[in-house]
């Protein structure tokens, strides 16, 4: 059951060959056994999870089930869930129990899914390695010495180690796709505005987007069918006709024009990653796809642009955490200003403080025009590069990350090297485009490599179809980490 797809689990549940209670108990037992080492989950609540499973079993018995009813899911700890500790990986929210559900959580609850727990993450989603969490680093299940990627490292680890059949993630500059690649699973960041951000704790509001993480593209399609939809509580939510992301999965891909940006295949990519990506592209050639060289000339500016805009928005968003209404509050203070200063100094970690300082600096008088406005102009140029590229191709492909997972602690003292982990993913984020990563093989030290697929706006169904066809002729997505398979 641990390796079953969501469709297979759905069939077993609907045919009453297993109950949701049995399935949930099996995953909870596995979490208990493996989580002390992997640290993928911050919070588990067996009683709550089993209560939800019991409700799901009743839904199935009454004939009121959906394709996802009874299936457990892990929620990234950035999503508010009523009655659950919701920490965002920070000391600042270490005692915060959410009084309401995020729309994403609410939609999965209504579909009858079971919340297995809240997964570990980089503090306030700021990080590329899941090392900035107040709750300690997450280990990569393929190699316990390696990082799982970030910021959705707990979710990626949970799916890869079969602690959960699916998980939610959030992506600001690559936080779904990068950990999906480094942990050998599938993950998709939809077009900005497709998935509601209501109840998803904000990092950079013009970039943040929730999305699913699972073993395969087919699983992602099933999850997106529930996740996507207009929400009037989110002012950036898009109102579009409902789409079924599973209906075109089997379409042939012959004649598909795949764009290969020359900038993505230049220096910076390690040879082991390059070899895996070349082999993946060869599979698409066999499937009948054609390749077109395209150019994204401003992509080299994506990381500096991202690290001006995202911290600027973060410095504003995180100003709400001051110890007054909720969250951590310093024990001793002499005035209101002292309360603010000590609470934020003690409650935020080093990386979060660094980004707040950068953001405050680029928004300050005298630097706003030089940094923030310039970055906004360059962001538009990056989006324009993609517009021109998509006139020549249907999809864009390349590596998700320049290297395989690095070792825990390797880049902690070098923020610039850490930030460059987002070099391929931040471009799509800045343009608001959908991007996904699927497992494509293994590089050095037998660590996973991800293939990055970028689609035009609202082309998630096409991306999932293209990924699914690849997964029908390869088995990378079915492999399990050796130390966690039993």
Curated annotation (Swiss-Prot):
Lineage: superkingdom: Bacteria
Family recorded in the similarity comment: Belongs to the amidase family. GatA subfamily.
Key words of the record: ATP-binding, Ligase, Nucleotide-binding, Protein biosynthesis
Record-linked Pfam families: Amidase
GO biological process: translation
Catalytic site positions: 76 (charge relay system), 151 (charge relay system), 175 (acyl-ester intermediate)
UniProt organism field: Nitrosomonas europaea (strain ATCC 19718 / CIP 103999 / KCTC 2705 / NBRC 14298)
GO MF entries: ATP binding; glutaminyl-tRNA synthase (glutamine-hydrolyzing) activity
Function noted in UniProt: Allows the formation of correctly charged Gln-tRNA(Gln) through the transamidation of misacylated Glu-tRNA(Gln) in organisms which lack glutaminyl-tRNA synthetase. The reaction takes place in the presence of glutamine and ATP through an activated gamma-phospho-Glu-tRNA(Gln).
Name of the protein this chain belongs to: Glutamyl-tRNA(Gln) amidotransferase subunit A
Catalytic activity reported: L-glutamyl-tRNA(Gln) + L-glutamine + ATP + H2O = L-glutaminyl-tRNA(Gln) + L-glutamate + ADP + phosphate + H(+)
InterPro entries, A to Z: Amidase, Amidase_CS, Amidase_dom, AS_sf, GatA
GO cellular component, one term: glutamyl-tRNA(Gln) amidotransferase complex
Subunit structure, interactors included: Heterotrimer of A, B and C subunits.
EC code(s) of this entry: 6.3.5.7
């Amino acid at each position: 059951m641990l390796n079953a797809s969501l469709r297979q689990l759905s069939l077993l549940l609907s045919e009453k060959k297993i109950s949701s209670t049995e399935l949930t108990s099996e995953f909870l037992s596995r979490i208990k056994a493996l989580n002390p080492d992997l640290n993928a989950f911050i919070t588990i609540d067996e009683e709550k999870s089993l209560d939800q499973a019991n409700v799901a079993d009743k839904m199935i018995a009454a004939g009121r089930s959906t394709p996802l009813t009874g299936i457990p899911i892990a929620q990234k700890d950035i999503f508010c869930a009523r009655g659950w500790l919701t920490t965002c990986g920070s000391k600042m929210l270490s005692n915060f129990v959410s009084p309401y559900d995020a729309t994403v959580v609410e939609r999965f609850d209504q579909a009858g899914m079971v919340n297995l727990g809240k997964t570990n993450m980089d503090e306030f989603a700021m990080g590329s390695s899941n090392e900035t969490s107040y709750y300690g680093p997450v280990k990569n299940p393929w190699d316990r010495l390696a990082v799982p990627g970030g910021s959705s490292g707990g979710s990626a680890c949970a799916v890869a180690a079969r602690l959960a059949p699916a998980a939610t993630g959030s992506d600001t500059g690559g936080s779904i796709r990068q950990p999906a690649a480094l942990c050998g699973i599938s993950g998709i960041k939809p077009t900005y505005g497709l998935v509601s951000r209501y109840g998803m704790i904000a990092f950079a509001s013009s970039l943040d987007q929730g999305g699913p993480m699972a073993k395969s593209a087919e699983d992602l399609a099933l999850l997106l069918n529930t996740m996507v939809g207009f929400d009037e509580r989110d002012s950036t939510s898009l109102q579009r006709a409902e789409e079924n992301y599973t209906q075109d999965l089997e379409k042939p891909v012959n004649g598909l024009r795949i764009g290969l940006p020359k900038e993505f295949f230049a220096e910076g990519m390690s040879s082991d990653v390059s070899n895996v990506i070349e082999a993946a592209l060869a599979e698409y050639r066999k499937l009948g796809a054609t390749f077109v060289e395209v150019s994204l000339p401003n992509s080299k500016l994506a990381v500096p642009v991202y690290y001006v805009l995202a911290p600027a928005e973060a410095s504003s968003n995180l100003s709400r955490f001051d110890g007054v209404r909720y969250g951590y509050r310093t024990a001793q203070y002499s005035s209101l200003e002292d309360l603010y200063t000590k609470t934020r100094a003690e409650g935020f970690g080093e990386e979060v403080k660094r980004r707040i300082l950068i953001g405050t600096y680029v928004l300050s008088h005298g630097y706003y025009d030089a940094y923030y406005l310039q970055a906004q102009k360059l962001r538009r140029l990056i989006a324009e590069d993609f517009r021109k590229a998509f006139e020549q191709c249907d999809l864009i492909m390349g590596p998700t990350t320049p290297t395989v997972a690095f070792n825990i602690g390797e880049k902690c003292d070098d923020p610039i090297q850490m930030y460059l982990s987002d070099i391929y993913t931040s471009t799509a984020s800045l343009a608001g485009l959908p991007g996904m990563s699927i497992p494509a093989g293994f590089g050095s030290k037998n660590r996973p490599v991800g293939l990055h697929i970028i689609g035009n706006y609202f082309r998630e169904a096409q991306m999932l179809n293209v990924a699914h066809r690849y997964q029908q002729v390869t088995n990378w997505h079915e492999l399990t980490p050796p130390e966690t398979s039993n």
